[in-house]
């Protein structure tokens, strides 16, 4: 239920930013600040989650969203009302999209645990392919499609969605693998393992803000290219270094900082490439690609 709510709120929050800031320069700064909220959570989440898991129970982590959600509700009540546009639902698109993502998610997670050769896993992956095809057909025929496929005619939109997917594959893949390594191989507690990621995650907010400044001076593509390059170098370093904890932690810094530099500018480029009334739709598409990327990363690296 919390995941469903987050999936609704995240694109809507970006649409609000797009609506509130018509000037591209101010909007870029606002998106960078928006990204800082997520990166601060990334920095504190592993530590807080580890502390709650060790001290109380893994169930306690789900209560972390309550104070944040209440604060957001209070602040949102003071924001200007958004213009409303009546849009019919797209039942066929919604059902086929949910079926495709659910089947894909279950298939890759279960396949990562039990093997991709099992009939149940193969059936889920086949269902995902069929549902994706049905979704594409439904969207081409719908009078009011949930995701107009014309968005993908824009090379900018396609590239931004692909980058979002790749970023989460790298980020969550690294977090997942090293979390297991720190705890199972090195015998660290959940709290200590969470602290190992602080050198990486603590710099993410600064990288988010730097992204907006670099983008305003050199154009938004500059921080994207620079961030992805720095991140790739960090990931290559992770592959090359030995299992010494100090070297692993040091290699995490460029891997994470580069992503923090690239992501806000990816969002800026995406929102600038589409009409304002499609901002929520495009943000939802980007968020979906990122979540699928994170899911696939965990499933693949779990093997």
Name each region found by the language model.
Residues 1, 18, 62, 71-72, ...:
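Conserved protein kinase catalytic domain
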Residues 1-92, 276:
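Helix-loop-helix hairpins in multi-pass membrane proteins, especially solute transporters
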Residues 13, 45, 67, 100-101, ...:
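ATP/adenylate-binding site constellation spanning eukaryotic-like Ser/Thr protein kinases
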Residues 32, 54-164, 170, 188-189, ...:
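Hydrophobic transmembrane-helix bundles of small-molecule transporters
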């Amino acid at each position: 239920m919390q995941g469903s709510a987050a999936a609704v709120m995240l694109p809507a929050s970006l649409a609000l930013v797009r609506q509130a800031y018509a000037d591209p320069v101010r909007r870029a700064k606002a998106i960078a600040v928006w990204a800082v909220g997520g990166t601060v959570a990334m920095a504190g989440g592993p530590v807080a989650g580890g502390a709650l898991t060790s001290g109380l129970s893994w169930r306690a982590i789900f209560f972390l969203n309550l104070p944040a959600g209440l604060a957001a509700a209070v602040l949102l009540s003071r924001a200007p009302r958004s213009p409303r546009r009546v849009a019919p639902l797209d039942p066929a698109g919604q059902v086929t999209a949910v079926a495709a993502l659910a089947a894909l998610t279950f298939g890759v997670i279960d396949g990562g645990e039990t093997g991709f050769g099992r009939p149940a896993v193969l059936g889920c992956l086949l269902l995902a392919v069929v549902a994706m095809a049905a979704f594409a057909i439904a969207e081409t025929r719908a009078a009011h499609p949930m995701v107009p496929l014309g968005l993908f005619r824009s090379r900018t939109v396609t590239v931004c969605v692909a980058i979002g997917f790749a970023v989460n594959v790298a980020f969550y893949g690294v977090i997942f693998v090293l979390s297991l390594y720190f705890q199972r191989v090195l015998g660290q507690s959940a709290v200590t393992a969470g602290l190992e990621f602080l050198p990486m995650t603590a710099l993410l907010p600064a990288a988010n803000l730097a992204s907006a400044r670099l983008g305003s001076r050199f154009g938004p593509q500059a921080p994207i290219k620079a961030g992805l390059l720095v991140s790739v170098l960090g990931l290559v370093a992770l592959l090359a270094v030995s299992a010494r904890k100090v070297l692993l932690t040091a290699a995490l810094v460029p891997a994470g900082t580069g992503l923090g530099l690239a992501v806000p500018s990816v969002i800026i480029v995406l929102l600038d490439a589409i009409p304002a009334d499609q901002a929520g739709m495009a943000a939802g598409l980007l968020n979906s690609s990122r979540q699928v990327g994170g899911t696939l990363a965990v499933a693949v690296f779990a093997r």
